[in-house]
C-alpha cells in the first residue's frame, strides 16, 4: 500500500485497512471526530487486493483504470504491479463494501482491452509470516 496512490488525504485508515494504527484515546487530533463516527457507523468502501485472472503474464497497470461490475463502473484502480513470487498481476482498488468480498469478479478496462479480475486475500505470499519468522 502506497501513500499518495492507495492511501491519500481523501481516504481514512479504516477504509485502507489500517484502523489498528489509530489510537482514538490518545487525545484530540484533526479528524478524530470523523474517525470516531466512521468506526461506529462502519465504512462504505474498503481498499481491496485484486488479481487478474485472465493471464499470469505481466500487464502494465498505470492506476486509474476503470473497474466494472455487472456492466457498471464501480471504481478505479489505485495502483498495481506484478508479483513475481506469486506470478500474478496485483491491483489495489477501493470497492463498495458489498463488493469487497473474496471471489467477487470484475472486469478491468485496460489499454490493451478488458481483463477479468477478482478480489483475493490481502496477503498473497506467506500470509502467516512463517518464512519471515523461520
Predicted regions and their residues:
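Conserved, structured C-terminal
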Residues: 1-134
Amino acid at each position: 500500500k502506497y501513500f499518495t496512490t492507495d492511501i491519500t488525504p481523501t481516504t481514512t485508515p479504516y477504509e485502507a485497512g489500517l484502523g489498528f494504527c489509530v489510537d482514538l484515546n490518545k487525545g484530540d487530533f484533526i479528524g478524530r471526530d470523523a474517525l470516531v463516527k466512521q468506526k461506529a457507523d462502519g465504512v462504505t468502501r474498503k481498499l481491496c487486493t485484486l488479481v487478474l485472472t485472465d493471464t499470469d503474464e505481466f500487464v502494465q497497470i498505470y492506476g486509474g483504470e476503470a473497474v466494472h461490475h455487472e456492466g457498471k463502473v464501480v471504481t478505479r484502480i489505485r495502483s498495481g504491479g506484478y508479483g513475481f513470487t506469486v506470478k500474478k498481476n496485483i491491483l489495489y482498488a477501493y470497492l463498495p463494501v458489498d463488493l469487497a468480498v473474496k471471489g467477487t469478479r470484475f472486469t478491468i478496462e485496460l489499454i490493451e482491452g478488458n481483463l477479468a479480475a477478482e478480489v483475493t486475500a490481502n496477503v498473497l505470499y506467506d500470509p502467516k509470516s512463517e518464512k519471515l519468522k523461520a
